[in-house]
């Protein structure tokens, strides 16, 4: 059992969008293979949420900008003595390759938007109980197909997201590893600091404290209020040690 809990909080809109996309893509794979109605609804609901996120912003444009920004940051390390040059070059090539694949890929989510089954299910998801067999006979018969046939279709849907997934995973890994965790101490459940143009806060808390952070702020400044899980009887210590990384 984990003794520490990791919390992440975005400090700008692009990071908020990227974390939501990452979460939804991870959710798509959790219940595979899909063999029943509950698993299917979980899968299609996450597909629908993912398409909604895609429609709200220029996901590809922002990712391409970030891939270029990360390449420039790596270039600045080339002249630093003692740096692993091979590692730097390998990362630069990965960023360059991910950018090339992403820029040449079809519109993100286009295959999913054009799929008839996905479109039919999306229309019914907002209706309470709207995915019953009499409402969605298409889904009902799909769930009675051979497992291999469903698996192949799902694999095709997920493969259409690969250019995005590859670029996003690379970018988020670099951002998450851009700053080390440092020990900090809150006083009376409160902590604040400068953001130093960070994109992401990562915070580690001991599980046995049964506390969680409420974080507000932006890239220049942020504040953290620690709250007890048990809102009635839980206590927040006068001094609380935790680990924080501003990435």
UniProtKB/Swiss-Prot annotation:
Keywords: Cell cycle, Cell division, Cytoplasm, Septation. Belongs to the ZapD family. The gene is zapD. Interacts with FtsZ. Its main location: cytoplasm. This is Cell division protein ZapD. Cell division factor that enhances FtsZ-ring assembly. Directly interacts with FtsZ and promotes bundling of FtsZ protofilaments, with a reduction in FtsZ GTPase activity. One of its GO terms (biological process) is division septum assembly. It holds the Pfam family ZapD. It is found in: Cytoplasm. The keyword Signal does not apply. PANTHER family: CELL DIVISION PROTEIN ZAPD (PTHR39455:SF1). One of its GO terms (cellular component) is cell division site.
